[in-house]
Amino acid sequence: MSRLLHAEEWAEVKELGDHHRQPQPHHLPQPPPPPQPPATLQAREHPVYPPELSLLDSTDPRAWLAPTLQGICTARAAQYLLHSPELGASEAAAPRDEVDGRGELVRRSSGGASSSKSPGPVKVREQLCKLKGGVVVDELGCSRQRAPSSKQVNGVQKQRRLAANARERRRMHGLNHAFDQLRNVIPSFNNDKKLSKYETLQMAQIYINALSELLQTPSGGEQPPPPPASCKSDHHHLRTAASYEGGAGNATAAGAQQASGGSQRPTPPGSCRTRFSAPASAGGYSVQLDALHFSTFEDSALTAMMAQKNLSPSLPGSILQPVQEENSKTSPRSHRSDGEFSPHSHYSDSDEAS
């Protein structure tokens, strides 16, 4: 569609044509001017830039704001608007294209100068990362530098901890196996309860001491069983009676006459019968003493012994020693270190046999 132009609009078109005919070294010859767009668009794009911009060099980005170049942009915009089907959409898109073109030219002209002075964004990011601590991370996915080291340290520590646990487990297994072997060797008195480690060591010590005592006997371990406690007391009284020559000698003589006058009685089973030669009396002969016939002598001999010890301090103190030895031979109740008494952990086989 052809549109009629007013006289004022025609004059402006002619001025634009004169500007295009002027020779410009940095532009190619332009085609003939297209028909002028409507007056509304020209009114909007009236040159508002100062004329001093036309004196700038072509390399300066501000030279694109000069009126001559603005005329070229206006003519191209008018040609584009004439061939566009929708005027409203083209009017809105034309200023955007101009702004985009100017921005690209400004970036191209200023890119060469600024690239040599300022480093790129990647270099700036690397420098900042080095200042922060040394971990460089790119958008494309760079590997970290400190994370693998921490993982390696954790792995080494875990391996060391597992190795230490395995060594401790093997040590405890070996110790328990050794205690089991020791429990099988020492006597347990048919006790269903499993002995603790402390009780096992204590029983082993007692058992070893008993075996060493058996080996130190002169008969090679074939010593007779010890007499009962009643026989031991009779031996003690007979020793004390034999040490005196006074009233004790008269009592032994009377006992000897009674034994020779009567028939000899058999020894009951389980009793103690010990015969030994007493020292010579005033008559000059020795007799065999029977301990079973001196039931009334025990109290008198003990009284005489205590009286003699009180009267004569020079009497040796070994007379009362056998009594103390008999009391000490009974197995005392030793207590465990933890305060708990174990009846089976303080006696040996020799004590049971006696």
UniProtKB/Swiss-Prot annotation:
The keyword Nucleus applies. Keywords: Activator, Deafness, Developmental protein, Differentiation, DNA-binding, Neurogenesis, Non-syndromic deafness, Nucleus, Transcription, Transcription regulation. It is found in: Nucleus. Residues 1-55, 91-122, 216-277, 312-354 are annotated as: Disordered. One of its GO terms (molecular function) is protein dimerization activity. Signal peptide: none annotated. One of its GO terms (cellular component) is nucleus. Residues 159-211 form the bHLH domain. CDD domains: bHLH_TS_ATOH1 (cd19713). Residues 1-21, 94-107, 335-354 have a biased composition (Basic and acidic residues). Residues 108-122, 250-264 have a biased composition (Low complexity). It holds the Pfam family HLH. The keyword Metal-binding does not apply. GO terms for biological process: auditory receptor cell fate determination; auditory receptor cell fate specification; axon development; axon guidance; central nervous system development; central nervous system neuron differentiation; cerebral cortex development; epithelial cell apoptotic process. Transcriptional regulator. Activates E box-dependent transcription in collaboration with TCF3/E47, but the activity is completely antagonized by the negative regulator of neurogenesis HES1. Plays a role in the differentiation of subsets of neural cells by activating E box-dependent transcription. It is linked to Deafness, autosomal dominant, 89: An autosomal dominant form of non-syndromic deafness characterized by progressive hearing loss, with onset at birth or early childhood. Efficient DNA binding requires dimerization with another bHLH protein. This is Transcription factor ATOH1. It comes from Homo sapiens (Human). The gene is ATOH1.
